[in-house]
Amino acid sequence: MAAALARLGLRPVKLVRVQFCPFEKNVESTRTFLQTVSSEKVRATNLNCSVIADVRHDGSEPCVDVLFGDGYRLIMRGAHLTTQEMLSALASHIRDRNAAAASAPGADKVAPGTSTRR
């Protein structure tokens, strides 16, 4: 898990929402994922990224919802995933988003719904 933590950077991530019921038996990996993502070392990679813990007592399935800056959304159902699987999936999507941002010209990039007229 240390290797996944070392390469985890939240630069392209806008929001991480972790939702779980603490009284269910299958939430340990989701809670560990939340601890990892909300650590100071990981949070320092993007100070504009919000990490939200949504703790409910409704018996709901643990869920991790990651919103990237380009509008892409990653939803992981944590009931049958290990912490390592969730971290490696997030790291893989972050690498893909970084590669997509690097290949697109930065000056010509316009957010959807905006115009370039001044």
Curated annotation (Swiss-Prot):
Disulfide bonds: none annotated. GO terms for biological process: mitochondrial translation. InterPro entries: mtLSU_mL53 (IPR052473), Ribosomal_mL53 (IPR019716). The keyword Endoplasmic reticulum does not apply. Belongs to the mitochondrion-specific ribosomal protein mL53 family. PANTHER family: 39S RIBOSOMAL PROTEIN L53, MITOCHONDRIAL (PTHR33618), LARGE RIBOSOMAL SUBUNIT PROTEIN ML53 (PTHR33618:SF1). It is found in: Mitochondrion. Signal peptide: none annotated. The keyword Ribosomal protein applies. It holds the Pfam family MRP_L53. Residues 99-118 are annotated as: Disordered. GO terms for cellular component: mitochondrial inner membrane; mitochondrial large ribosomal subunit; mitochondrion. Its main location: mitochondrion. This is Large ribosomal subunit protein mL53. Keywords: Mitochondrion, Ribonucleoprotein, Ribosomal protein, Transit peptide. Component of the mitochondrial ribosome large subunit (39S) which comprises a 16S rRNA and about 50 distinct proteins.
